[in-house]
Swiss-Prot record:
Catalytic activity annotation: 1D-myo-inositol hexakisphosphate + ATP = 5-diphospho-1D-myo-inositol 1,2,3,4,6-pentakisphosphate + ADP; 1-diphospho-1D-myo-inositol 2,3,4,5,6-pentakisphosphate + ATP + H(+) = 1,5-bis(diphospho)-1D-myo-inositol 2,3,4,6-tetrakisphosphate + ADP
Disordered: annotated span: 100-160, 362-383
Location of this chain's protein in the cell: Cytoplasm; Nucleus
Modified residues (Phosphoserine): 151
An MF annotation (GO) of this entry: ATP binding
Pfam families: IPK
Name used for this protein in its record: Inositol hexakisphosphate kinase 1
Species, as recorded: Rattus norvegicus (Rat)
EC number assigned by the record: 2.7.4.21
Lineage: Eukaryota, Metazoa, Chordata, Craniata, Vertebrata
């Protein structure tokens, strides 16, 4: 289906999916909760997304103090369609070679990377992490209708062990329980349709390799927040700028500098992920935003009060870093807040509920595990949380790519959003002590 040079991709981990001896079969990243570009799983520790030159350059130019708050940039791969023996078309990644003719998402920007990337970034690595639920394969059937630009038929060959359930606009549960975040599937279908409609000449596509920031979490609860009071880049057309400004004015982006773009939260009482998408987030009032944040921190049994300080500490640290980044603008960037939905304390709490016991033990320490028969917890330890900035396709700073517009001072719209997010979380913490 496409012509690629025969190259050795490298050592495959035990969780790798191979496409012949040369390529890596890309799988859907089932924990994608927002965005419009499809994220694909490359291996346990790595995801990939369609390359946009500005975003690639931005990752290569990140200030060192921002790297704690962004996914690690791992390089570039070439991606193309390939057919299998069952008549399905899959996305397969190959090592990127600079001499290849490759397509990327930002049509006006076709320049090649300024440097070659180490082969380390092209090796498919495995791990011993508990991510069996992420092993899914996305493909679509070839048929007479496959030349149409409508959404392809998608078949997921394996699924998450934890069902996902979308919340409707009335805050009620949908009847459908599926094995992947519904927004993830939507993005995959749209991405495949775009690529298929552009693939008449069997072109290769460039994809960025990035750290999978949820790979540390067994049951990742993810909140995707669109940050800032402005979303359009300096190079946006007047029409697009007006459209983005309307979205901001009609949402909490204008009033708070932040709006919900997507969410999944694990519910201990049902064993499901509850999901929200960007359309829900756009319609929220300030009070609605507060309620959404409360819902994100609630596991179906309790408000996770133990999460307040770890998350607030991360947010304050990020705010301090961004206040020092003069001329930087992160238009249309998102912020991911992540925690584990089934840590030791949570499982002990569920045991107490099942046994009718009133007290919840303190946080678990190294000496305690959910499998212990005793319900006594060891020394307390803070829960694992993470905060990461993503999506830099419209970011800029002084001297970046000779951008004609240069801004003064830090990104005040982004910082404004962080200040309000911190304030709302502090109020919620104080009200629920």
């Amino acid at each position: 289906m496409c012509v690629c040079q025969t190259m050795e991709v490298g050592q495959y981990g035990k969780n790798a999916s191979r496409a012949g001896d040369r390529g890596v079969l890309l799988e859907p990243f089932i924990h994608q909760v927002g965005g419009h570009s499809s994220m694909m799983r490359y291996d346990d520790h790595t995801v990939c997304k369609p390359l946009i030159s500005r975003e690639q350059r931005f990752y290569e130019s990140l200030p060192p103090e921002m790297k704690e708050f962004t996914p690690e940039y791992k390089g570039v791969v070439s991606v193309c369609f390939e057919g299998d023996s069952d008549g399905y078309i899959n996305l397969v990644a190959y090592p990127y070679v600079e001499s290849e003719t490759v397509e990327q998402d930002d049509t006006p920007e076709r320049e090649q990377p300024r440097r070659k990337h180490s082969r380390r970034s092209l090796h498919r690595s495995g791990s011993g992490s508990d991510h069996k639920e992420e092993k899914a394969s996305l493909s679509f059937e070839t048929s007479e209708s496959s030349q149409e630009t409508k959404s392809p038929k998608v078949e997921l060959h394996s699924h998450s062990d934890v069902p996902f359930q979308m919340l409707d606009s009335n805050s009620g549960l949908s009847s459908e329980k599926i094995s992947y975040n519904p927004w993830s599937l939507r993005c995959h279908k749209q991405q495949l349709s775009r690529m298929r409609s552009e693939s008449k000449d069997r072109k290769l596509y460039k994809f960025l390799l990035l750290e999978n920031v949820v790979h540390h979490f067994k049951y990742p609860c993810v909140l995707d927040l669109k940050m800032g009071t402005r979303q359009h880049g300096d190079d946006a057309s007047a029409e697009k700028a007006a459209r983005q400004m309307r979205k901001c004015e009609q949402s909490t982006s204008a009033s708070l500098g932040v709006r919900v773009c997507g969410m999944q939260v694990y519910q201990l009482d049902t064993g499901h992920y509850l999901c929200r998408n960007k359309y829900y987030g756009r319609g929220l009032s300030i009070e609605g935003f507060r309620n959404a944040l409360y819902q994100y921190l609630h596991n179906g049994l309790d408000l996770r009060r133990d999460l307040f300080e770890p998350i607030l500490s991360k947010l304050r640290g990020l705010k301090a870093v961004l206040e020092r980044q003069a001329s930087y603008r992160f238009y249309s960037s998102s912020l991911l807040v992540i925690y584990d939905g089934k840590e030791c304390r949570s499982e002990l709490r569920l045991k107490h509920v099942d046994m009718g016991l009133p007290e919840v033990p303190p946080l678990c320490g190294p000496s305690t595990s959910p499998s212990n028969t005793s319900l006594e917890a060891g020394p307390s330890s803070p829960p694992k949380v993470d905060v990461r900035m993503i999506d830099f396709a419209h970011s800029t700073f002084k001297g970046f790519r000779d951008d004609p517009t240069v801004h003064d001072g830090p990104d005040r719209g982004y910082v404004f959003g962080l200040e309000n997010l911190i304030s709302i979380m502090e109020q919620m913490r104080d009200e629920n002590q």
